Amino acid sequence: MSYAEKPDEITKDEWMEKLNNLHVQRADMNRLIMNYLVTEGFKEAAEKFRMESGIEPSVDLETLDERIKIREMILKGQIQEAIALINSLHPELLDTNRYLYFHLQQQHLIELIRQRETEAALEFAQTQLAEQGEESRECLTEMERTLALLAFDSPEESPFGDLLHMMQRQKVWSEVNQAVLDYENRESTPKLAKLLKLLLWAQNELDQKKVKYPKMTDLSKGVIEEPK
C-alpha cells in the first residue's frame, strides 16, 4: 500500500481481537489500583488490597490519616474545621494558594445557605469574601452565583442548585487533596487517571485526522462503538 492510499477500515471485532491479544501483567494492574487508592486517600481499601494482592503501597498508609480526616470534614460540610486542620498541618498552604482558600470559604458560605442561616451567610460573604471578589473577577462571579441561592425559596431546585449537591463538596475535596499532595511533593494525580487522559488525547488526535476507528465512548463502562 502506498502512502497516498487510505488504510482499510478496521471493524470493532477486529479491534477487540487485537486488544485481546495484548497482555497486561496482573502486577501492573494491581500497582495502578494501589496507586489510585493511595493517591485518593482510601486507606482501608488500600490495606485490604495489599493483603489480597501482595502489592506494597509506595508510602506508609498511616500518613493518609490526616488527609482522610480532612476529606470526612469537607464531605460532611464541616468546612471551618477542615480549614483549621489544614492550617495546623501546613500553615502556609492556604496563604500561598488563594484560590483554594477562596473555594473553601465559598463552600462554607454554601453550607450556611444550606442551613437557611441567611443573616450569617450575608455577613460571612461581606466580611470574608468581598475583598477576594474585588481582587478577582472569577471569584466575584462564583460569589455572586453562590449568593443567588438566597433568592429562591427552594435553592436546591434553582438554576444554581448544583452548588448544593454532594458533588460540589467532592469537587472541593479533590482540589484540597491535590493541593496537599503537591505541597508535600507527592504524586497528586493517580496514574490511572493519566492513562485515561492519554486515551482521550489519542482518540481526539484520530478524530481530528478524520480516522474511522472503534471509539471508546464510555470510560466508566469501557463501551466501544463501531467506526462511524
From Swiss-Prot:
The protein's location, in the record's own words, is: Cytoplasm; Nucleus
What are the boundaries of the region Interaction with CTNNB1? 116-212
Which Pfam families does the entry mention?
CTLH, LisH
Keywords assigned by UniProt, alphabetized? Cytoplasm, Nucleus, Ubl conjugation, Wnt signaling pathway
Tell me where in this chain the LisH domain is found.
Answer: 25-57
Q: Name one GO biological process term.
A: positive regulation of canonical Wnt signaling pathway
InterPro entries per the UniProt record, alphabetical: CRA_dom, CTLH/CRA, CTLH_C, LisH, Ubq-SigPath_Reg
Looking at the record, the residues that make up the CTLH domain are 63-120
Question: Which tissues carry this protein?
Answer: Ubiquitous.
The record's GO molecular-function terms, alphabetically, read: protein homodimerization activity
Q: Which GO terms describe its cellular component?
A: cell junction; cytosol; nucleoplasm; nucleus; ubiquitin ligase complex
Q: How is it modified after translation?
A: Polyubiquitinated through 'Lys-48'-polyubiquitin chains, leading to proteasomal degradation in the absence of Wnt stimulation.
Q: How does it assemble?
A: Homodimer; may also form higher oligomers. Identified in the CTLH complex that contains GID4, RANBP9 and/or RANBP10, MKLN1, MAEA, RMND5A (or alternatively its paralog RMND5B), GID8, ARMC8, WDR26 and YPEL5. Within this complex, MAEA, RMND5A (or alternatively its paralog RMND5B), GID8, WDR26, and RANBP9 and/or RANBP10 form the catalytic core, while GID4, MKLN1, ARMC8 and YPEL5 have ancillary roles. Interacts with RANBP9. Part of a complex consisting of RANBP9, MKLN1 and GID8. Interacts with CTNNB1, AXIN1 and GSK3B.
Q: What does this protein do?
A: Core component of the CTLH E3 ubiquitin-protein ligase complex that selectively accepts ubiquitin from UBE2H and mediates ubiquitination and subsequent proteasomal degradation of the transcription factor HBP1. Acts as a positive regulator of Wnt signaling pathway by promoting beta-catenin (CTNNB1) nuclear accumulation.
Belongs to which family?
Belongs to the GID8 family.
What name does UniProt use for this protein? Answer: Glucose-induced degradation protein 8 homolog
Q: Which organism is it from?
A: Mus musculus
